Regions:
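Short, structured interface segments
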Residues: 36-42, 127-142
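Internal/C-terminal transmembrane anchor helices
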Residues: 20-48
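Terminal, regulation- and interaction-focused segments at domain boundaries
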Residues: 48-63, 142-157
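Low-complexity, repetitive regions of proteins mediating host interaction that are extracellular
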Residues: 11-14, 20-29, 153, 157, ...
């Protein structure tokens, strides 16, 4: 972006020194100059869109922040005691949990919890809601069938988080990210700018005091 700006500045100087340049040419160059700087300013303020984080449960891929509940319903999943036509309301009282948190099951087997969020309005039918958060179940055996960004969770150990970078563990390469670590919690935040324009993603890993896994989670945050 800086190189584009420098190029435009040099072009303006060169053309203004030439008395034979048409006014329309100068106007075009001036417009290009302003456009490039407005673009750079917007990118500085809002950042760049990050790649969404996929979660795979058995043979089903869920794009957190994009996949609708109807897609999982079609593949045999259920959400708590709710049906496809049930009303889901987003109370907008929490920065992390949007809509309603419900247990997700398939063939009477729990696969954790998901937040279902209406889009464009405060209340909508469950089938129209977007999945904005996923948390793995407490049953460690279920991790064999779950992956985050195509990384099998059953293969991960606490030692991995103590010795490796989170972006390497989950095989992501974001341009903008932040890491928060304690003895038991490891959080990778992708897109640290305000999430008014672009979605922010968080991959969360929580361990018990004995080093065993408590849960993994993926969430998408978005104000619009």
């Amino acid at each position: 972006l800086k190189s584009i700006g420098k190029f435009v500045v040099l072009a303006i100087r060169k053309n203004f020194q030439n008395s034979h340049v048409y006014a329309s040419t100068n106007a075009f160059i001036g417009t290009a100059f302003l456009t490039s700087y407005v673009f750079m300013f917007c990118m500085m303020m809002s950042g760049l869109p990050a790649q969404p984080v996929p979660v795979t449960i058995q043979d089903t891929t869920v794009i957190i922040g994009e996949t609708k509940a109807s897609e999982l319903l079609d593949q045999g999943y259920t959400f708590g005691d709710k049906g496809a036509e049930s009303s889901i309301t987003n109370p907008k009282n929490d920065h992390f949990y949007y809509g309603q948190l419900l247990e997700v099951k398939r063939d009477n087997q729990s696969y954790g919890f998901m937040s279902l969020t209406p889009t464009g309005k405060d209340t909508d039918q469950l089938k129209n809601c977007v999945i904005t958060y996923y948390r793995t179940p407490k049953d460690k055996n279920q991790l064999e069938e779950i992956s985050i960004n195509h990384v099998k969770l059953a293969n991960l150990k606490l030692q991995d988080f103590q010795t490796r970078k989170l972006i390497n563990i989950f095989e992501v390469n974001p341009t903008d990210y932040n890491v928060a670590e304690t003895d038991a919690n490891y959080i990778l935040t992708i897109q640290t700018a305000d999430y008014d324009l672009w979605k922010r993603y968080r991959i969360e890993s929580k361990f018990n005091s004995d080093g065993s896994i408590d849960s993994y989670g993926v969430r998408a945050q978005h104000s619009m």
